[in-house]
Amino acid sequence: MVCRFVHHSRVIFISIYDFLSTKGKKNMYNYTQEKKTKQKNTFTQASIYYENFFESYRTISCL
């Protein structure tokens, strides 16, 4: 899996394994995950919201 981190106009791709292994150090605020089926393919989307991360809320989407 690869995560897309949106920070202003920059998009940074990081490994989901590397990210989740350090989620405890990043002050996780909320975690939601949902599975969707599209064109006979199953995608998993996860949005991770952080509090006080870069001084505001940021979203990381994983596919």
From Swiss-Prot:
It comes from the Eukaryota. This is Uncharacterized protein YPL038W-A. It comes from Saccharomyces cerevisiae (strain ATCC 204508 / S288c) (Baker's yeast).
